[in-house]
Amino acid sequence: MQNEYSQFEQRKRDHIELALMPANQSSELNPFDHFSLVHEALPDLDFKDISIQSIRFKKPVEKPFIISSMTAGHSNALEINYRLMEACSKTKWAMGVGSQRRELTDKQAAFEWTPLRRDFPMVSLFSNLGIAQLIDTPISAIQRLIDTLQAEALIIHCNPLQECIQPEGTTNFQGCWTALEALVKKIASPVIIKETGCGFSKNTLLRLNNIGVAAVEISGVGGTHWGRIEGHRANKDPIRQRTADTFRNWGIDTLQSTRNAISLNPSFEIWGSGGVRNGLDAAKLFALGATTVGFAKPMLEAALGSTGQVLTQMNTIEYELKTAMFCTGSRVLDDLKEKACP
């Protein structure tokens, strides 16, 4: 078991290093540059009156941003997550934690969150578990993950391509829909479904809407591509390496995935993420109808430096969003919906 934990920690460290490599970014497929907002030369408003307030789980929130789930369960995670949570405590951003899978078998792993929650009790956090683990995990154990974190909601992440290419991948997803539907019915916390860089089809989103999930985090193609990352890790497995190269552009991009969701007029909230690198990208997602926007790689890069760098990144994104709103004559986020170029 100890050897398994050592391998787990090494895999998580690999993920951090590889996630920052340009080769593992599907930025050449990023759609944001091909989507524009209508410029307003005479915006009849005062910049200081612009509001970026949004709604999350039917309640108003001051900031419409989250740090998308990244890393947990290894020795380097504590410092990274401390900086991220410290910054969130100052900006009122929310945060999805990395996978809590290890906590299911290692009781000590849960103590990672004790000092973080002690120092930052007011930060809105979301628990996180993979769909493959959900299938075989009792609801009571999942509830413990939420309780340990004092989480506002639970993220279930879906990563079929990553699991196929990861040397240690879990590729048995049979029963995932049944398990997900049971979870939504039995657990009190809001359930968020998140992809990990490959986006969502309209049919999948329709099924998610029918079972009553609270939110879908799009995480489409255009940002960090986990198929590419696992291909780099599978350097002793030529079959997985070649497969990673074949599927290097696999998935549905963030804007198309968001449009797929909007077209359904769903009951779930649409959270835009996947290749979002600045506040202008965020503005475009709000214009399409997202109510929350998530950032991962930009925050990870900053958190490897300092809390100050994370705060600078957050403040810049907020200012860029407000600049996009001012230059389109949008006083509130909903106004952006009328400013998308046809």
Curated annotation (Swiss-Prot):
GO biological process: isoprenoid biosynthetic process
The keyword Flavoprotein is annotated on this UniProt entry: yes
Record-listed substrate binding positions: 11-12, 99-101, 162
EC numbers: 5.3.3.2
Matches recorded under Gene3D superfamilies: Aldolase class I
Cofactor requirement: FMN; NADPH; Mg(2+)
Major location category of this protein: cytoplasm
Protein location: Cytoplasm
Catalytic activity: isopentenyl diphosphate = dimethylallyl diphosphate
Keywords attached to this entry: Cytoplasm, Flavoprotein, FMN, Isomerase, Isoprene biosynthesis, Magnesium, Metal-binding, NADP
Function: Involved in the biosynthesis of isoprenoids. Catalyzes the 1,3-allylic rearrangement of the homoallylic substrate isopentenyl (IPP) to its allylic isomer, dimethylallyl diphosphate (DMAPP).
NCBIfam families: IPP_isom_2 (TIGR02151)
Protein's recorded name: Isopentenyl-diphosphate delta-isomerase
Organism from which the protein derives: Legionella pneumophila subsp. pneumophila (strain Philadelphia 1 / ATCC 33152 / DSM 7513)
Gene symbol of the encoding locus: fni
